[in-house]
């Protein structure tokens, strides 16, 4: 806190002197974690609204699939109406939270093919009778992935495993198959608490790979830090996480990744920042796979050619449309679809083909990003905005345009300026809303427009640079600057460019110490419209105290 106060006069000098205390126009609570698909949701939400009203709040931001209304049931709308009526009774403005690109939102309910696509280029297929099947080219594997070959405490073929004989051990008593596994324990024997095994593998650029491993845990802490990792340079090609219990019998973890322009990758399985407990790994595999979750939309075309590329075959004449009947973002452990030949096809039995397509990626446990360059996305937004207006005569809206972790990889957006594309996306969203209500005030999460947060190059799987994105969004957009610890540089960034800001803070802390830091910054920053109590873990115990601190009742 002392650092915050000593930096205030210097870092915020461009925003003017200490501002006189004025009542904040926006005194909001973030209502998150309820989808209105159960009666209990309303029962749990309304007491929060009542607490907010008692402590001087004037708005409730609701995140409850409000951009997928055409998919909802009558029961959903009845519950939404109950929440709306409660807000009216308590004099709280109900503010919808909609239109997520980073997390897909309602757009994926309409069409999962709108997911951003990663390119597979010229994968090998061989024709057998009336179908062509994918063939690994070249075959890849994890050498000694069964952990059967070792000398003493050292496993063969791996670049390293942490602290053999201290943290990592061959285990011939506990294994998934064969006669051994690799066990990790005593994580704090090294300061970082890491317990990993790594191997370098040669891959083919722009191919899709499936990696799996079997893991067993015993009193593992923290279990969420157990993961698979694929590194190419400084980029993580598979930023995936798994919900693994602290204690569990053998279970299989599987992910897919695209090699992109790389011909070698470093693959890891292990724990980062381990504290206690132990875990085992076994039967670690890696393989190139075919068109699992092939995306079909204008920006993700499928191309089939002869092996030398001299002949391009026609979909609908030479082969049936390549689709995946088992399409699922969550199930990768299944066979890839084959390419079916049609009667009269120019493709012959025994022929080798080169096939190109696009596939999605899941980030962490469940994040799937949609493509901002696909026109159909905005048709869905327009349709859903009209339905939302029928239910809620919204005067304010917050756009869920945070953490856009993919982009610039499918044909609809490859080569585009990602900062400009993001800004154009937001501008179209605002235009859609203002067609319906010309006076609507639009708010937006800050991170993708903040160079001190996520508005930069080399962001997750994005091919491109978000630097300068703030130059392409409407200037009357209110920026919801979010986070736990105060960030004066972020507030200054937006204030200097004439944006008003809403401070979305708290972030599930055990106390309001960080909120007090944000409060101090707000008093010295022009254009702060107010605060939003923001929790992602349904921690509302400090809701009343938050309001009392900031606007006092």
Summary of predicted features, one role per range:
Residues 1-4:
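Positively charged n-region of N-terminal signal peptides that target proteins for export
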Residues 453-517:
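Glycoside hydrolase catalytic-domain groove-lining segments
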Residues 505-553:
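Substrate-binding cleft of secreted/luminal carbohydrate-active enzymes
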Residues 6-16:
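Bacterial N-terminal signal peptides
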Residues 25-139, 145, 356-473, 477:
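Aromatic-lined carbohydrate-binding surfaces of glycoside hydrolases
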Residues 255, 351-359:
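Short, hydrophobic/aromatic-enriched beta-strand segments in well-ordered soluble domains
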Residues 18-20:
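Boundary at the C-terminal end of the N-terminal hydrophobic targeting segment
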Residues 129-343, 348:
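Extracellular and organelle-lumenal recognition/adhesion modules and their flexible linkers in secreted
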């Amino acid at each position: 806190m002392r650092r915050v106060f000593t930096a205030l006069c210097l870092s915020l000098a461009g925003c003017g002197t200490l501002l006189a205390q004025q009542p904040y126009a926006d005194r909001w609570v973030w209502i998150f974690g309820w989808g209105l698909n159960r009666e209990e949701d309303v029962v749990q939400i309304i007491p929060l609204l009542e607490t907010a009203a008692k402590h001087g709040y004037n708005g409730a931001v609701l995140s409850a699939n409000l951009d997928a209304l055409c998919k909802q049931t009558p029961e959903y709308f009845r519950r939404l109406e109950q929440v709306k009526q409660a807000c009216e009774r308590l004099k709280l403005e109900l503010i919808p939270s909609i239109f997520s690109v980073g997390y897909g939102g309602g757009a994926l309910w309409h069409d999962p093919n709108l997911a951003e696509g990663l390119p597979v280029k010229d994968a090998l297929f061989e024709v057998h009778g009336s179908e062509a099947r994918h063939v690994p080219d070249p075959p890849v594997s994890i050498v000694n992935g069964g952990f059967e070959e070792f000398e003493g405490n050292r496993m063969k073929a791996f670049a390293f495993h942490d602290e053999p004989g201290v943290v990592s051990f061959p285990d011939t008593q506990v294994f998934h198959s064969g006669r051994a596994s690799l066990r990790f324990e005593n994580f704090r024997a090294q300061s970082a608490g890491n317990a990993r095994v790594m191997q370098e593998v040669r891959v083919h650029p722009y191919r899709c790979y499936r990696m799996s491993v079997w893991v067993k845990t015993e009193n593992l802490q923290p279990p969420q830090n157990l993961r698979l990792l694929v590194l190419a340079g400084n980029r993580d090609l598979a930023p995936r996480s798994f919900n693994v219990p602290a204690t569990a019998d053998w279970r299989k973890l599987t992910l897919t990744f695209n090699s992109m322009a790389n011909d070698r990758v470093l693959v890891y399985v292990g724990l980062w920042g381990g504290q206690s407990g132990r875990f085992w790994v076994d039967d670690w595999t890696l393989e190139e796979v075919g068109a699992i979750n092939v995306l079909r939309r204008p920006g993700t075309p499928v191309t089939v050619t002869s092996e030398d590329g001299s002949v391009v075959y026609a979909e609908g004449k030479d082969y049936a449309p390549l689709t995946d009947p088992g399409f699922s973002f969550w199930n990768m452990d299944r066979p890839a679809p084959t390419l079916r030949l049609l009667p009269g096809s120019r493709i012959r039995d025994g022929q080798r083909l080169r096939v190109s397509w696009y596939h999605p990626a899941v980030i962490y446990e469940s994040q799937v990003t949609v493509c901002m360059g696909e026109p159909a996305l905005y048709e869905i937004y327009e349709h859903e905005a009209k339905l939302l207006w029928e239910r809620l005569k919204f005067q304010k809206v917050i756009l869920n345009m945070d953490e856009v972790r993919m982009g610039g990889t499918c044909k609809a957006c490859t080569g585009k300026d990602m900062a400009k594309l993001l800004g154009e996306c937001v501008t179209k969203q605002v235009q859609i809303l203002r067609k319906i209500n010309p006076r609507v005030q639009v708010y937006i999460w800050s991170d993708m427009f903040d160079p001190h947060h996520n508005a930069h190059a080399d962001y997750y799987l994005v091919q491109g640079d978000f630097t300068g994105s703030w130059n392409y969004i409407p200037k009357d957009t209110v920026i919801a600057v979010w986070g736990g610890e105060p960030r004066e540089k972020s507030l200054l960034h937006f204030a200097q460019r004439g944006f008003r800001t809403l401070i979305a803070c708290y972030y599930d802390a055990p106390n309001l110490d960080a909120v007090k830091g944000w409060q101090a910054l707000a008093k010295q920053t022009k254009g702060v419209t107010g605060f939003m109590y923001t929790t992602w873990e349904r921690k509302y115990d400090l809701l009343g105290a938050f309001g009392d601190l900031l606007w006092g009742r």
